[in-house]
Amino acid sequence: MAFLSLFLCLVFSSPLMAMPPALQGRKAISPASILKGPSTDNGARDFHGRKFPHFMMQLYQNIISRRDKDLSNLEHPTLQESDTVQSFIAKSYTTKGNHWTLFFDMSSISTSNELKSAELRICLPSFGKSHSVTVEIYHTKDDKEKLFMGSFKTKISSALDADCKVFNLTMVLHNYLTKGKRLIKDEYIQAKGLLLRDLEKSATETGAERVDIVKQDKHHVSDFSAERIILVVFAKEKDHAKPDPPSLGKKLFPSKYGMADSANKVNGFRRLRRNKKEKTRMDVGTTPPKPVEEIKPKCRKVDMFVDFQKIGWGSWIVYPKAYNAYRCESACAVPLNETDDATNYSYIKSLLPLSDTDRRECPSCVPVKMRSMSMLYYENEDFVLRHHEEMIVEECGYKDI
């Protein structure tokens, strides 16, 4: 609840019983409207001048439209056991005859996540004839280091019904994450008998860098580009022995949570565990007895609208742009100790500009049922669909203190 509490502190300065005027005049933005928005010739969509795969928005729209249904009905059954979906647009590619070499920057893949599935999606133009090709996958960071990860052979044929081919790369990424680059590189040398520098030399000599497919076959469509090549990774946060801080809090303030060396990384979804502190009680002899006829004020759920643009997150959050997180309200004079819970909800609430009265919650009138929310946003240059726990209050109730 820490994330939502921090979020609530930034937005409102009065009790929230209705949608704020600032949001009433805003045009609603839906995933469908983004899908219909401007796109490049290669199928990538634009958001604030940044491109993201059309497939990721479709996947997000699928999830929110079937929120109350079994996820196994979705296109990807692995969504049922994943809480993070990362997409990586190819940095570049080369072609030489029937060899394709694809380069991705996979630096943001975290070993603290459990890999569930990985797939390569190549959205091809229509071909006039079939081609048998060998596809090689490399990891590269700023073109300073190129690490061979694996290869496979496939037959590329005319793609009139579906313009995207999907290849299962789960084992390739699993070997990379668990065995390390040394073992992978050795396997490449033994299997191919060709060093990376030899491959690069031959590509340079033939001018193959960023070669358009049209030069290889006159029937190929000339608009094929690296942005049509996407690596999609499905993962799940591993269980940890210690409670974790809110997932969104770790993204924005890594140094605060001891993550200074990985400030630009988000290590997947956090299943937040409460770290309840022992509450010190007053001696029974010094506590005045409560009147028997005392009636507790009503504990109710009221609106608390969150606008990501207003708190400075609009440039990297694609969807949702705003949502109703709700909060619990009851008459009381003792504030809830914000260190008692560390959740996404409490973090969000602490970001909103609530008045002291609105920010304060009765220790006994608290959220008793929360639900998660899927979010679509950028992590550096990568496009991520992530499922954050405890983002929205569903029910309020009294809790003994």
UniProtKB/Swiss-Prot annotation:
One of its GO terms (biological process) is gastrulation. Its main location: secreted. Disulfide bonds join 299-365, 328-396. One of its GO terms (molecular function) is growth factor activity. InterPro entries: Cystine-knot_cytokine, TGF-b_C, TGF-b_propeptide, TGF-beta-rel. Expressed in the dorsal marginal region of late blastula, becoming restricted to the Spemann organizer at the early gastrula stage. Residues 19-274 form a propeptide. SUPFAM superfamilies: Cystine-knot cytokines. GO terms for cellular component: extracellular region. Residues 1-18 form the signal peptide. Belongs to the TGF-beta family. Exhibits mesoderm-dorsalizing activity and neural-inducing activity, but lacks mesoderm-inducing activity. Regulates the expression of specific mesodermal and neural genes. Induces convergent extension movements at the embryonic midline by activating the fgf signaling pathway to induce t/bra expression in the organizer region. Acts with wnt11 to induce Spemann organizer cells and induce axis formation. The unprocessed protein antagonizes bmp-signaling. This is Nodal homolog 3-C. It comes from Xenopus tropicalis. The lineage of its organism: Eukaryota, Metazoa, Chordata, Craniata, Vertebrata. The gene is nodal3-C.
